[in-house]
From Swiss-Prot:
It is found in: Membrane. InterPro entries: ST7. GO terms for cellular component: membrane. The modification Phosphoserine is found at residue 386. Keywords: Glycoprotein, Membrane, Phosphoprotein, Transmembrane, Transmembrane helix. The gene is ST7. Glycans are attached at residue 47. This is Suppressor of tumorigenicity 7 protein. It comes from the Eukaryota. The keyword Transmembrane applies. Belongs to the ST7 family. PANTHER family: SUPPRESSION OF TUMORIGENICITY 7, SUPPRESSOR OF TUMORIGENICITY 7 PROTEIN. It is a multi-pass membrane protein.
């Protein structure tokens, strides 16, 4: 019974929907019938005569003014359409038609039709969109005092945006603070320092934290004269204060390295003490987690200082030791620093070993992973690659593997080749990047362009093959080939991360819709005709009459038919006559 009742209700509902669909036709015929019945009381014939008389009395100037007014309104609509498209990336009229008018006219709403299918895939797609649009810490970020500030002193431009620096401040508060910092005066000061917006205020707070720690140790040491050395070890200096000074106050890499070495001494002592107390409660566990982050950060920056100062082998050893000591801390992406250092040493076998570990389907990809894999495969064939020879004999297996690796890398981040091929100018990389975005492309090319130039023929192979990727994925926002569809949010996030003087690379490149171009041409042509008709009415009348005579002439019709149907002389039964004198004029 329940199934029968449900079926009856569904049938009744479908009948009602069907009746509402065709109700407008019934309404239309009813209106026509009422107009016919009331034609005498409403004096429809007299009104039609009056309207026709009014239209006959109108002069051509009225039509010219009407055309000009309509062209002006169309131009305003066009300007609004262009502004809306530049800001939101879509046509306003198209969006209104699809979103609002299509459901009213009986169109199918994609959201409602796919409601049943979206329940299974919503979670996966949402997770993917969140991961694709997540902002990551740049593993190869520069030093503010020794590199970013020097760029500002020379050029007068700010290489970092407020949004980027705000994200760095949030990272510092996450990595270098914990809930028990208020128990130690120096850590309490540094907790406030990481939230300061003014760089000088942060540097002053770091010096204050070091001075407080020094004064406290001097006061407590004389209390127990027999254990002076023990008291000095009990009160280590603040490691996070040294980190801030090394990052922002040091004007050279050598000065930053000295400060990081002092921070390492203080941070190592705090780490060993908190390691022994981490199981005594949640407070000690949080403190040990903070000390671990501080120690890993210091060692990583020391390795980067060694890399900047030319001690590449020492930097590689420090990075390997750090990855062995803390294998679970993947948030710093130390393997990307290691890959760049190994490429500098031209240790391609070691690079391949690192890629074999991290270029896994279960691990998140990056431009460094994909393009380094492409570089290694291109290195095997790039010195002998020739586009002409490849077009004649076809691609070999090794060349095909290299081309596929380049296509894979370009699909992941299509902005990188423009910087590697020097089609766009490089800027200093930001402190945060967006995977598959322009910011990640800048960060990768800034450090890896020299490695591509060092491999003979690699850039030539990239130049010949990278654009072929776009033929494999004609609709990258809807469907990808080896990766998920390209995220839409990259342009907005990159504009927040990159400085205003840099032209953000957009993919896929937005083109003006045909509707806007057609409207612009039609409005411009109509406005020009209206202006010419108003200024030169007699001349435009002669021109219009001549055009009508040309298009209505027999010669033009014969010539048009001959050009379309490709008639031959035998079918005409006479030789083709030359064009008439009237048509030649």
């Amino acid at each position: 019974m329940a199934e029968a009742a449900t079926g009856f209700l569904e049938q009744l509902k479908s009948c009602i929907v069907w009746s509402w669909t065709y109700l407008w036709t019934v309404w239309f015929f009813i209106v026509l019938f009422l107009v016919y019945i009331l034609r005498v009381p409403l004096k429809i014939n007299d009104n039609l005569s009056t309207v026709s008389m009014f239209l006959n009395t109108l002069t051509p100037k009225f039509y010219v003014a009407l055309t000009g007014t309509s062209s002006l309104i169309s131009g305003l609509i066009l300007i609004f359409e262009w502004w809306y498209f530049r800001k939101y990336g879509t046509s306003f009229i198209e969006q209104v038609s699809v979103s609002h008018l299509r459901p009213l006219l009986g169109g199918v709403d994609n959201n409602s039709s796919n409601n049943s299918n979206s329940s299974n895939g919503d979670s996966d797609s949402n997770r993917q969109s969140v991961s694709e649009c997540k902002v990551w810490r740049n593993p190869l970020n520069l030093f503010r005092g020794a590199e970013y500030n020097r760029y500002t002193w020379v050029t007068g431009r700010e290489p970092l945006t407020y949004y980027d620096m705000n994200l760095s401040a949030q990272d510092h508060q996450t990595f270098f603070t914990c809930d028990s910092d208020h128990l130690r005066p120096a850590d309490a000061i540094m907790q406030k320092a990481w939230r300061e917006r003014n760089p000088q205020a942060r540097i002053s707070a770091a010096h204050e934290a070091l001075e407080i720690n020094e004064i406290r140790s001097r006061v407590e040491v004389p209390l127990i004269a027999s254990s002076t050395i023990w008291e000095i070890k009990l009160l280590p200096k603040c490691a996070t204060a040294y980190i801030l000074l090394a990052e922002e106050e040091a004007t050279t890499i050598a000065e930053a390295e000295k400060l990081f070495k002092q921070a390492l001494k203080a941070g190592d002592g705090c780490y060993r003490r908190s390691q022994q107390l981490q199981h005594h409660g949640s407070q000690y566990e949080a403190q040990h987690r903070r000390d671990t982050n501080v120690l890993v950060y210091i060692k990583r920056r020391l390795a980067m200082c060694a890399r900047r100062l030319g001690r590449t082998r020492e930097a590689v050893k420090m990075m390997r030791d750090l990855m062995k000591e803390f294998p679970l801390l993947s948030m710093f992406n130390i393997h990307e620093n290691l890959l760049e250092a190994l490429l500098e040493l031209q240790a391609y076998a070691d690079v391949q070993a690192v890629l074999a570990k991290y270029d896994d389907i279960s691990l998140p990809k990056s431009a460094t992973i994909c393009y380094t894999a492409a570089l290694l495969k291109a290195r095997a064939v790039s010195d002998k690659f020739s586009p002409e020879a490849a077009s004649r004999r076809g691609l070999s297996t090794a060349e095909m593997n290299a081309v596929e690796a380049i296509h894979r890398a370009v699909e992941f981040n299509p902005h990188v080749p423009k910087y590697l091929l020097e089609m766009k100018s490089l800027i200093l990389p930001p402190e945060h990047i967006l995977k598959r975005g322009d910011s990640e492309a800048i960060a990768y090319a800034f450090f890896h362009l020299a490695h591509w130039k060092r491999v003979e023929g690699a850039l030539n192979l990239l130049h010949c093959t990278w654009e072929g990727t776009f033929r494999m994925i004609p609709y990258p926002l809807e469907k990808g080939h080896l990766f998920y569809p390209y995220p839409i949010c990259t342009e907005t996030a990159d504009r927040e991360l990159l400085p205003s003087f840099h032209e953000v690379s957009v993919y896929p490149k937005k083109e003006l819709p045909f509707f806007i171009l057609f409207t612009a041409g039609l409005c411009s042509f109509t406005a020009m005709l209206a202006l010419l008709t108003h200024q030169f009415p007699e001349l435009m009348g002669v021109f219009a009459k001549a055009m009508i005579d040309i298009f209505c002439s027999a010669e033009f019709r014969d010539w048009n038919c001959e050009s379309i149907f490709m008639r031959v002389e035998d079918d005409l039964e006479m030789p083709p006559a030359p064009q008439s004198q009237h048509f030649q004029k």
